[in-house]
Amino acid sequence: MIRQFFKVTLVVSMVASVLVGCNGSEPLGMGSEESISKIKELVKTNVDMNENKIYELQWEEDNGEHKLENMLSSITVGYIDKENNDYKLIIELKDGEFVAGEPDKNEKWKYSYEKSTALNLDDINAGLLKKMVKEGYDLFMTQEDSTQYDLKSVGKYRFYIYPVKVGREHLLAENESFKKEYTTMVSYFDLNFIKKDEAPEVRG
């Protein structure tokens, strides 16, 4: 079971975009098989899956020069180690290569490695992303004046399973709704739409 949320962003400038990704040496798109394979490769390279549990995976398109071009630019990974420490790792596109920063440790909370449920990366695939985008698009098209807009890009995909805080592990056995909430993968994504009659943005 996947709980799904999405946000619509209406923007006023038009730029070229591709929703399925690129091939060869061109930038990776947001939702192609090639992109997802690269994301998983980067995650597994930078996070030891045998020593850590990943509970969050997010990737975003470029928000600068290539905004709305559906170009993969950053990946964020949330994970817990066996000492119940929580980390965030950001992998960013720099000069054509993805570079991992230093993991940022959460000094406020500790999460139970043993009781938290890890994301299954195999559950995240291009078919799922296409289904999510289609459902979000179809829902947007039921809104008033929706035909005045075109879908230009996906700004973000996020998948996560709520990690269990240390001290709350007992609730998994005592509360069925708590167990369901903390073992269910949640998906979230942003769709960017532009108004059809807006003039293209000129870049110099």
Q: Where are the regions that the model predicts?
A:
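Bacterial signal peptide processing site
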Residues: 23-25
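C-terminal motif of bacterial Sec signal peptides marking the signal peptidase cleavage site
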Residues: 18-21
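Short glycine-rich, low-complexity/disordered patches
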Residues: 29-37, 41-69, 138-168
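Long, charged/polar, surface-exposed segments that mediate recognition or autoinhibition
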Residues: 101-152
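Exposed beta-strand-loop-beta-strand "reactive/processing" segments of non-cytosolic proteins
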Residues: 51-90, 157-193
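A short, surface-exposed interaction/processing loop segment used at functional sites
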Residues: 95-121, 185-204
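Bacterial N-terminal signal peptides that target proteins for export
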Residues: 1-10
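Short loop/beta submotifs within extracellular cysteine-rich repeat domains
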Residues: 43-47, 84-86, 136-144, 181, ...
